[in-house]
Design a protein with these regions (language model features):
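Terminal amphipathic alpha-helical/low-complexity segments used for targeting or macromolecular assembly
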Residues: 1-97
Length: 97
């Protein structure tokens, strides 16, 4: 499913969509944990997640996250598309369904 379609799905869900920063409208083929995500996969990152320190090592093409300037700055510098919501865990669950 195209990333823009996933954004539309999340907008209609319960995770309280804030914004999306799409650098490339890629086809998302699957979802995975941030530490094992591959290209064309989406993952999520909560604000206080220990995996935040390893963000530069992920191969995920898109990440669902909260409105945290530090995380958003890192994602932008890594050119990783992101979907910003109030509750990344709920949005990730919505994507899995």
């Amino acid at each position: 499913m195209l990333l823009s379609k996933l954004v539309d799905l999340i907008k209609s869900g319960e995770s309280k969509f804030i914004k999306a920063n799409i650098f490339e409208n890629i086809d998302i083929e699957n979802a995975a944990s941030l530490d094992i995500a591959l290209k064309n996969q989406i993952s999520f990152l909560e604000e206080n997640n220990i995996l935040k320190d390893n963000l530069g090592k992920t191969s995920a093409s898109a990440i669902i996250t909260s409105n945290n300037n530090e995380i958003l700055g890192l994602l932008e510098s890594l050119n990783i598309s992101n979907i910003v919501v109030e509750n990344p865990r709920i949005a990730f669950a919505e994507v899995l369904n």
